[in-house]
């Protein structure tokens, strides 16, 4: 995976939110993988760079990133059928058995 530098604004666009579910909690405890909702146009290198930049104060390093494109479900509204938007999620493995503190986000360092 190539190393790229992205700005802090793009980092916040790439990483939308962590996924909180039973499966995500199980993976975080057993396999040390964290699941994030990410932007649909993001690639693995951007996701890795964004996570390392957002949680730079915790010295987080990413070991690997796997991406899944999820199709939106069809929903029915009375007699009309609509479809939810497609989305993308990333499974991120961290180096050195670190854990991310989601409340500690520092993008701009004080000088």
Swiss-Prot record:
One of its GO terms (biological process) is translation. InterPro entries: Nucleotide-bd_a/b_plait_sf, Ribosomal_uL23-like, Ribosomal_uL23/eL15/eS24_sf. Disulfide bonds: none annotated. GO terms for cellular component: ribonucleoprotein complex; ribosome. Keywords: Ribonucleoprotein, Ribosomal protein, RNA-binding, rRNA-binding. The keyword Ribonucleoprotein applies. NCBIfam families: PRK05738.1-3, PRK05738.2-4. Belongs to the universal ribosomal protein uL23 family. This is Large ribosomal subunit protein uL23.
